């Protein structure tokens, strides 16, 4: 973040936080922090069922996607104990020429360059700070920031306390979520209800942990634990071991009427930084072969989920799917001169569904990233996912190129 003195952007922020009594422009913007980002993504996805049927894809039937996202953040000190935050976001997905089909196989045409979408308010909240009790109270529209969500936004309140060194206590309530605008809530997600919860986060280097508990009204009780430990062998050989467990107990009506099952997720990962190399390996297990179960509320949440496609494949979607999954993974990367990183990752395993043949899945990912400057990064990856079920063989090739600027 940087302090803005006088600019068009800061004037816009001043307008967002105008008081009942007029003040000078210089006075209004003197304590406004401005930050933000701009991201452009080009991506293309091609799925081949192995019998000549190609869904989506590139080349002659391309459905290339151009995704633009920009955020402008303004944080203003209103008084000694109050701050206001607003985030404006611009986000579009523009498809190239070709046939695009949705998850139901229906043809969707969305071709052309978008020149009409505008910035919208993504977050807007008021924050009260009591330094004597090391407590912050936040209420409004904000990112949920839970272990079950990635970047979901909800309307509600949080209370955060840091009165004990190394410990953070949090309580939260969300009355609604940006389910329609986000696009990463699953159709079977339990994110359709108010969420009440608490968390304890501890960081006592080299040991850290998180304990989460929540109640999704009339849906489920959710709980999660994350623990990690760091250790080293000499200079330049740093290791970290991490374990996670997430579970939920669904309302009996949802089990009986919708045939859902209680969710259970476990994962373990060992990672290492040895000189210019970074390595990781581990296992992940979750799901139920007899009914739909849910692990996360939105996208892949903050769980251990390596790879780029496998956790979105049929039977393996973390926001709700039918299938018992067990995967193992490994990856290695090398960074040149602290700027250019090349990486390779592998994820493999099986999805089981009662009454069906097991699906063997393997994903191979090659990635590259280049830190042009502390603020500007270029990156990309190629992912190849195979799914084998008896005589059926499918493969999915996914490419993404990205430019990201932060300030």
Question: Residues of each region from the PLM?
Answer:
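Beta-barrel outer-membrane channel/assembly domains of diderm bacteria
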Residues: 2-140, 160-162, 227-235, 243, ...
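Glycine/serine-rich loop-strand microenvironments at binding/catalytic pocket rims
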Residues: 20-37, 41-54, 58-62, 198-215, ...
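Solvent-exposed loop segments that connect transmembrane elements
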Residues: 48-58, 100-110, 176, 183-189, ...
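Outer-membrane beta-barrel proteins
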Residues: 58-62, 142-150, 216, 246-261
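Solvent-exposed loop/turn segments connecting transmembrane beta-strands
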Residues: 118, 144-156, 175-180, 190-192, ...
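Transmembrane beta-strand segments that form the barrel wall of outer-membrane beta-barrel proteins
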Residues: 134-146, 157, 169-176, 198, ...
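Internal metal/ion-chelating core segments
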Residues: 161, 166-229
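Detector for outer-membrane/organellar transmembrane beta-barrel domains
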Residues: 203-206, 228-352
């Amino acid at each position: 973040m940087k302090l803005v003195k006088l600019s068009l952007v800061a004037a816009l922020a001043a307008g967002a936080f105008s008081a009942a009594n007029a003040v000078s422009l210089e006075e209004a913007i003197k304590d406004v922090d401005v930050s933000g980002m701009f991201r452009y993504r080009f991506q293309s996805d091609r799925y081949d069922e192995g019998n000549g049927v190609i869904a989506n894809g590139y080349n002659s039937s391309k459905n290339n996607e151009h995704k633009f996202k920009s955020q402008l953040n303004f944080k203003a000190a209103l008084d000694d104990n109050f701050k206001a935050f607003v985030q404006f976001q611009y986000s579009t997905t523009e498809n190239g020429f070709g046939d695009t089909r949705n998850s139901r196989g229906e043809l969707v045409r969305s071709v052309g360059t978008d020149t009409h979408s505008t910035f919208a308010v993504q977050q807007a909240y008021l924050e009260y700070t009591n330094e004597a009790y090391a407590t912050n109270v936040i209420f409004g529209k904000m990112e949920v920031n839970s272990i079950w969500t990635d970047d979901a936004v909800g309307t509600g309140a949080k209370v955060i306390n840091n009165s004990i060194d190394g410990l953070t206590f949090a309580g939260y309530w969300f009355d609604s979520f940006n389910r329609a605008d986000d696009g990463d809530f699953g159709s079977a997600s339990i994110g359709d209800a108010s969420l009440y919860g608490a968390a304890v986060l501890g960081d006592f280097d080299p040991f850290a942990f998180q304990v989460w508990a929540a109640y999704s009204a009339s849906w489920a009780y959710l709980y999660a634990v994350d623990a990690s430990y760091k250790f080293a062998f000499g200079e330049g050989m740093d290791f970290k071991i991490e374990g996670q467990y997430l579970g939920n107990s669904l309302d009996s009506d949802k089990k009986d009427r919708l045939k859902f099952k209680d969710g259970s997720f476990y994962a373990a990962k060992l990672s290492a930084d040895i000189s210019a190399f970074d390595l990781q390996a581990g296992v992940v297990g979750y799901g139920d072969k007899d009914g739909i179960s849910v692990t996360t509320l939105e996208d892949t949440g903050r769980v251990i989920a390596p790879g780029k496609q496998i956790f979105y494949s049929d039977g393996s979607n973390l926001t709700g799917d039918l299938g018992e999954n067990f995967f193992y993974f490994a990856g290695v990367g090398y960074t040149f001169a602290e700027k250019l990183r090349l990486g390779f990752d592998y994820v493999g395993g099986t999805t089981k569904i009662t009454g069906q043949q097991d699906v063997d899945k393997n994903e191979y990912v090659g990635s590259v990233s280049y830190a042009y400057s502390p603020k500007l990064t270029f990156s990309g990856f190629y992912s190849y996912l195979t799914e084998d079920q008896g005589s059926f063989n499918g493969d999915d090739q996914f490419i993404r190129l990205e430019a990201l600027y932060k300030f």
